Amino acid sequence: MARYLGPKLKLSRREGTDLFLKSGVRAIDSKCKIDTAPGQHGARRGRLSDYGVQLREKQKVRRMYGVLEKQFRNYYKEAARLKGNTGENLLQLLEQRLDNVVYRMGFASTRAEARQLVSHKAIMVNGQVVNIPSFNVSAEDVVSVREKAKKQARIVAALELADQREKPTWIEVDSSKMEGTFKRVPERTDLSAEINEQLIVELYSK
């Protein structure tokens, strides 16, 4: 499946919630009618079957983290192999993606922008350049912006924007050095309560 390149707000309207695909300079409800389905007339959302609800939740999380269908299914399979709660394992694996960590640290205003920074070799992990967005970040790994990329306007702007957001408790960031430490894997209580990962588990368990 190809990566979606269309309007980002349309995806958030489709899922009925902010997927954090835009920079966050303005509240998303000031940009579009988030509670209204996409389309010229904002058709009413029909009642979904159990399968439809499960599918929508999977699509919501997949789009939020910017992961393709095949990748997402592979994450689920890995989560199912690990000990503990499969749904929680899935969210933790997604949170450990390098592009997500770069976003969480505030070096990018969106996960898509973070993915681009990683792909363009602007990011280092423990002093080594890593250009794989799906790279798995481990506890105590140090993620930093390469020296030659530190003056990029988008990174400076993203850090200013990040100062307005609540800081993740599992990450420590030194904005002046453009460097952060992934202190630990987040627990379920650290993450969004708007995600119902059990619906995704039920979908893939069929």
From Swiss-Prot:
CDD domains noted in UniProt: S4
SMART domains to which the protein is assigned, alphabetical: Ribosomal_S4 (SM01390), S4 (SM00363)
Family matches, as InterPro entries: Ribosomal_uS4 (IPR022801), Ribosomal_uS4_bac-type (IPR005709), Ribosomal_uS4_CS (IPR018079), Ribosomal_uS4_N (IPR001912), S4_RNA-bd (IPR002942), S4_RNA-bd_sf (IPR036986)
Taxonomy, superkingdom: Bacteria
GO biological process: ribosomal small subunit biogenesis; translation
GO cellular component: small ribosomal subunit
Signal peptide residues on this chain, from the entry's feature table: none
Pfam families, per the entry: Ribosomal_S4, S4
One GO molecular-function entry: structural constituent of ribosome
Keywords from the named record: Ribonucleoprotein, Ribosomal protein, RNA-binding, rRNA-binding
PROSITE patterns listed in its UniProt record: RIBOSOMAL_S4, S4
Complexes and interactors: Part of the 30S ribosomal subunit. Contacts protein S5. The interaction surface between S4 and S5 is involved in control of translational fidelity.
HAMAP family in the record: Ribosomal_uS4_B
Family membership: Belongs to the universal ribosomal protein uS4 family.
Protein name, entry field: Small ribosomal subunit protein uS4
Organism the protein comes from: Alteromonas mediterranea (strain DSM 17117 / CIP 110805 / LMG 28347 / Deep ecotype)
Phylogenetic placement of the source organism: Bacteria, Pseudomonadati, Pseudomonadota, Gammaproteobacteria, Alteromonadales
